[in-house]
Design a protein with these regions (language model features):
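Function-determining sites in protein domains
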Residues: 2-138
Length: 138
Protein backbone atom coordinates (compact mmCIF):
# COMPACT_ATOMS: atom_id res chain seq x y z
CA UNK A 1 0.00 0.00 0.00
CA UNK A 2 2.84 2.40 0.81
CA UNK A 3 4.48 1.79 -2.58
CA UNK A 4 1.24 2.69 -4.35
CA UNK A 5 1.13 6.06 -2.54
CA UNK A 6 4.84 6.78 -2.87
CA UNK A 7 4.98 6.62 -6.67
CA UNK A 8 2.30 9.32 -7.35
CA UNK A 9 3.80 11.55 -4.65
CA UNK A 10 7.26 11.31 -6.23
CA UNK A 11 5.77 12.07 -9.66
CA UNK A 12 3.92 15.14 -8.35
CA UNK A 13 6.99 16.45 -6.51
CA UNK A 14 9.15 15.94 -9.61
CA UNK A 15 6.58 17.75 -11.76
CA UNK A 16 6.44 20.69 -9.32
CA UNK A 17 10.23 20.97 -9.25
CA UNK A 18 10.34 20.97 -13.06
CA UNK A 19 7.67 23.70 -13.17
CA UNK A 20 9.57 25.85 -10.68
CA UNK A 21 12.79 25.52 -12.68
CA UNK A 22 11.04 26.14 -16.02
CA UNK A 23 9.14 29.26 -14.88
CA UNK A 24 11.94 30.86 -12.83
CA UNK A 25 13.00 34.37 -13.90
CA UNK A 26 15.82 34.51 -16.45
CA UNK A 27 18.25 37.42 -16.68
CA UNK A 28 18.51 39.53 -19.82
CA UNK A 29 22.22 39.93 -19.12
CA UNK A 30 22.76 36.43 -20.53
CA UNK A 31 22.19 37.67 -24.09
CA UNK A 32 25.28 39.90 -24.31
CA UNK A 33 28.82 40.11 -23.00
CA UNK A 34 31.31 42.95 -22.82
CA UNK A 35 33.27 41.78 -25.87
CA UNK A 36 30.20 41.56 -28.14
CA UNK A 37 29.07 44.24 -30.57
CA UNK A 38 25.52 45.57 -30.33
CA UNK A 39 23.09 47.30 -32.65
CA UNK A 40 19.72 48.62 -31.53
CA UNK A 41 16.55 49.89 -33.18
CA UNK A 42 13.93 51.81 -31.20
CA UNK A 43 10.52 52.15 -32.87
CA UNK A 44 7.38 54.01 -31.94
CA UNK A 45 4.20 52.80 -33.63
CA UNK A 46 0.90 54.62 -33.88
CA UNK A 47 -1.89 56.16 -35.92
CA UNK A 48 -2.06 59.87 -36.65
CA UNK A 49 -4.91 61.43 -38.66
CA UNK A 50 -6.00 57.98 -39.81
CA UNK A 51 -2.53 57.07 -41.10
CA UNK A 52 -0.34 54.42 -39.52
CA UNK A 53 3.26 55.42 -38.82
CA UNK A 54 6.46 53.89 -37.51
CA UNK A 55 9.19 56.20 -36.25
CA UNK A 56 12.45 54.29 -35.94
CA UNK A 57 15.83 55.31 -34.60
CA UNK A 58 18.87 53.16 -35.39
CA UNK A 59 21.73 52.96 -32.92
CA UNK A 60 24.51 51.43 -35.03
CA UNK A 61 27.70 52.87 -33.53
CA UNK A 62 27.45 52.18 -29.82
CA UNK A 63 30.42 53.41 -27.80
CA UNK A 64 32.08 51.38 -25.05
CA UNK A 65 30.50 53.58 -22.36
CA UNK A 66 27.07 53.18 -23.93
CA UNK A 67 27.58 49.42 -24.21
CA UNK A 68 28.55 49.22 -20.53
CA UNK A 69 25.41 51.18 -19.62
CA UNK A 70 23.30 48.82 -21.75
CA UNK A 71 24.91 45.77 -20.14
CA UNK A 72 24.20 47.11 -16.64
CA UNK A 73 20.60 47.82 -17.71
CA UNK A 74 20.23 44.27 -19.07
CA UNK A 75 21.48 43.01 -15.71
CA UNK A 76 18.54 44.68 -13.92
CA UNK A 77 15.74 43.10 -15.97
CA UNK A 78 14.36 39.59 -16.09
CA UNK A 79 11.91 37.70 -18.24
CA UNK A 80 9.90 34.51 -17.76
CA UNK A 81 9.02 31.55 -19.88
CA UNK A 82 5.35 30.85 -20.52
CA UNK A 83 3.60 27.62 -21.40
CA UNK A 84 3.57 28.86 -24.99
CA UNK A 85 7.31 29.56 -25.04
CA UNK A 86 8.06 25.92 -25.64
CA UNK A 87 6.02 25.92 -28.86
CA UNK A 88 6.51 29.53 -30.00
CA UNK A 89 8.08 30.52 -33.29
CA UNK A 90 8.97 34.07 -32.27
CA UNK A 91 5.83 35.76 -33.51
CA UNK A 92 3.80 38.05 -31.31
CA UNK A 93 0.66 40.01 -32.12
CA UNK A 94 0.43 42.38 -29.15
CA UNK A 95 3.20 44.92 -29.77
CA UNK A 96 1.99 47.95 -27.87
CA UNK A 97 3.20 51.32 -29.14
CA UNK A 98 6.97 50.97 -28.58
CA UNK A 99 9.48 48.31 -29.55
CA UNK A 100 13.19 47.87 -29.00
CA UNK A 101 15.31 45.48 -31.03
CA UNK A 102 18.77 44.56 -29.79
CA UNK A 103 21.11 42.58 -32.00
CA UNK A 104 24.23 41.06 -30.44
CA UNK A 105 27.17 40.10 -32.65
CA UNK A 106 30.39 38.21 -32.11
CA UNK A 107 32.57 39.67 -34.86
CA UNK A 108 30.15 39.59 -37.83
CA UNK A 109 28.08 36.65 -36.60
CA UNK A 110 24.65 37.36 -35.07
CA UNK A 111 24.54 35.37 -31.82
CA UNK A 112 21.46 36.78 -30.04
CA UNK A 113 18.49 38.95 -30.87
CA UNK A 114 16.05 40.57 -28.45
CA UNK A 115 12.77 42.18 -29.50
CA UNK A 116 11.01 43.87 -26.57
CA UNK A 117 7.51 45.34 -26.83
CA UNK A 118 5.80 47.81 -24.53
CA UNK A 119 2.97 45.29 -24.06
CA UNK A 120 5.20 43.02 -21.95
CA UNK A 121 6.18 40.51 -24.60
CA UNK A 122 9.82 39.88 -25.42
CA UNK A 123 11.11 37.67 -28.22
CA UNK A 124 14.60 36.29 -27.64
CA UNK A 125 16.16 34.18 -30.37
CA UNK A 126 12.75 33.42 -31.90
CA UNK A 127 11.08 32.35 -28.63
CA UNK A 128 8.36 34.46 -26.98
CA UNK A 129 8.55 35.27 -23.25
CA UNK A 130 6.86 37.63 -20.78
CA UNK A 131 8.63 40.63 -19.26
CA UNK A 132 6.99 42.55 -16.42
CA UNK A 133 8.74 45.92 -16.79
CA UNK A 134 9.07 45.90 -20.57
CA UNK A 135 7.84 49.46 -21.10
CA UNK A 136 10.27 50.83 -18.51
CA UNK A 137 13.06 48.76 -20.08
CA UNK A 138 12.37 50.24 -23.51
Amino acid sequence: MKKKMLCPIVIVITFLICCIVYFKPLSLSDVAEADNQMKMIYSQIGVENGEAYIDSVNYQDITIDQKNAILSLLDKYTYRRTVGTLFSNGSTSDLGNKTLSIYVYDDDLLINSVFATSSGKVVINEKTYNMEDAERFI
